[in-house]
Amino acid sequence: LIAQKHGGTIDKYIGDAMMVFFGDPDSEGEREDARACVRMSLEMQDKIKDLQKKWRNEGFADPFEVRMGINTGYCNVGNFGSEQRLTYTVIGGEVNVAQRLEAAAEPNGILISYETYAHAQDLIDVEPKGAIQMKGINRDIKTFAILNRVVKNQQGAAPESEKSEDYLIKETNLDQAE
């Protein structure tokens, strides 16, 4: 599955929705988990486009559409429920934000929060969609629609921001070794 390939945990299916979370049981850190989730969503979006094209060619006039919402933040993860029925899941306000981002996304679109954008901005081109208020959330949520992934330059080099971050990570690791 695409989600598992990128390190995601498939939490549950809710009607026609699928909930995937990153960071547990194994985490690469908040930044890398957010980036993995963005990569997963882009691969899922590509696969859906391929399926939609195939189904149209097979005569299905209106193949289904997919919306994705991604938020980054801390949640409670574990076994919840009663002794008779425990469920390994993720709960919390940040989960609610992700669900509401999904509901607000355009058909076949990916809507992300600023918290996710901050970690993955060098991977994607986005369109700012403004801040939205969500019932039960005590802050406005800045949103961005993912337009596409950032393409490497003709020589295959990564964007400059990615290079400098790699350098900073290496420099930090060297400092810790002293």
Tell what function each PLM region has.
Residues M18, P25, N71-N76, T116-Y117:
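Short, internal active-site loops enriched in acidic
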